[in-house]
Amino acid sequence: MRIDPTTSGSGVSTLEKKNPGRVVQIIGPVLDVAFPPGKMPNIYNALVVQGRDSVGQPINVACEVQQLLGNNRVRAVAMSATEGLTRGMEVIDTGAPISVPVGGATLGRIFNVLGAAVDNLGPVDTSTTSPIHRSAPAFIQLDTKLSIFETGIKVVDLLAPYRRGGKIGLFGGAGVGKTVLIMELINNIAKAHGGVSVFGGVGERTREGNDLYMEMKESGVINEENIAESKVALVYGQMNEPPGARMRVGLTALTMAEYFRDVNEQDVLLFIDNIFRFVQAGSEVSALLGRMPSAVGYQPTLSTEMGSLQERITSTKEGSITSIQAVYVPADDLTDPAPATTFAHLDATTVLSRGLAAKGIYPAVDPLDSTSTMLQPRIVGEEHYETAQRVKQTLQRYKELQDIIAILGLDELSEEDRLLVARARKIERFLSQPFFVAEVFTGSPGKYVGLAETIRGFQLILSGELDGLPEQAFYLVGNIDEATAKAMKLEMESNLKK
């Protein structure tokens, strides 16, 4: 952990004599600390517990003040394991919130919640730090210009386009491909836009965090030879961390992204995987602090905690932070308070469907459930809007006809409906796409499809020009020309078999 030089002089060493306290109670990750009268730390101040455990090993545990209890006591939440701590150990008030390194030196590195590098590449070469607790930008600083953020993923760009400087939610249950989609977005945006990304791994699997790091090194997003040329900083607070760390790691990642926006004046991508774990950690901490639970056992401060994080993610006149947040949906229930609270802050939602994943259509983005406030003619243009609406209408009609097809069969439909079903099935398959990050598993090279190409492809399917092509030709291809080439290849293979 860094100490913010602007607020705390030369760091912990000068504070030792000024404001030491003592641990008086430890309950799991929650510590009660007594301080001398008149020297109470502020809420959110970082405390450091120093001492030695039973075998003489040094202990250095950082905590964050959450409650002032009276009788010169505070209640703090630990950011790391509390094994080995005992009552009576010395606690130092740093006089400032947790502060983390920011700037170009963070790129290509992995940090924990305290801003300490955990990638075995040595200390971070920067003296610039920033506190993780800040207020959102003032209204007068905000930028209100509307523009699309092209991702190169067909289903996203056509049906639920992302806003530059907006907030996007990736909704889906376990195992439907949220993290793979996030990895593809980091890859595409780094390569196509030259953008800087910050990835906050909040309460997810350590294995996934490691896989993501290795994948980024392979794809060149993290440059091992010249680490300064990397395009992403990683901040991890994984499942095995105490709830305090998981609750604050999102703020650490956001603080790093804010520096790129406000000081370097860049457009930044902030990925949070998973925002539900941020809520879950807050719920654990709330219970440990003795607060009365609210609906479904969540913390009573759920909306406030979510708002304090989300309102800092915005576009200013200096730069923008576009945030893509994976949202685990408990039991696939979108009315659960955690995903429902998240919805209120989002400009677009990308909903992943278990049904599509079961069919083998990846990315398994549900074209009818996914939404975007950007899909308006005055923003995306008439051509894009009309194409998207016709695609949705075709898929909606196909969905309505599926019960009839299941009971009576395809032959009982009218000629017009049979044609519509054939086109809908082609559209459904054409919405799939091979990913760069999945090349290792599938053997198919990844494809980046520009928005103009995407619109052209779907217009050709809707117009009926490609009615003669088999539907499997549209599965896992990039643009429409590849689908046509695949159809010719399939026809040749079929003729050879005959």
From Swiss-Prot:
GO molecular function: ATP binding; ATP hydrolysis activity; proton-transporting ATP synthase activity, rotational mechanism
Keywords noted in UniProt: ATP synthesis, ATP-binding, CF(1), Chloroplast, Hydrogen ion transport, Ion transport, Membrane, Nucleotide-binding, Plastid, Thylakoid, Translocase, Transport
EC number: 7.1.2.2
PROSITE patterns with a match to the protein in the record: ATPASE_ALPHA_BETA (PS00152)
Compartment list: Plastid, Chloroplast thylakoid membrane
Binding site for ATP: G172, G173, A174, G175, V176, G177, K178, T179
Top-rank taxon: Eukaryota
Catalytic activity: ATP + H2O + 4 H(+)(in) = ADP + phosphate + 5 H(+)(out)
InterPro entries linked: AAA+_ATPase (IPR003593), ATP-synt_VA_C (IPR055190), ATP_synth_F1_bsu (IPR005722), ATPase_a/bsu_AS (IPR020003), ATPase_alpha/beta_chains (IPR050053), ATPase_F1/V1/A1_a/bsu_N (IPR004100), ATPase_F1/V1/A1_a/bsu_N_sf (IPR036121), ATPase_F1/V1/A1_a/bsu_nucl-bd (IPR000194)
GO BP term, example: proton motive force-driven mitochondrial ATP synthesis
Name of a matching Pfam family: ATP-synt_ab
Gene Ontology annotations for the cellular component aspect, listed alphabetically: chloroplast thylakoid membrane; mitochondrion; proton-transporting ATP synthase complex
Topology within the bilayer: Peripheral membrane protein
SMART domains: AAA
HAMAP family: ATP_synth_beta_bact (MF_01347)
Family: Belongs to the ATPase alpha/beta chains family.
Subunit structure: F-type ATPases have 2 components, CF(1) - the catalytic core - and CF(0) - the membrane proton channel. CF(1) has five subunits: alpha(3), beta(3), gamma(1), delta(1), epsilon(1). CF(0) has four main subunits: a(1), b(1), b'(1) and c(9-12).
Function: Produces ATP from ADP in the presence of a proton gradient across the membrane. The catalytic sites are hosted primarily by the beta subunits.
Protein name: ATP synthase subunit beta, chloroplastic
Native species: Nicotiana rustica (Aztec tobacco)
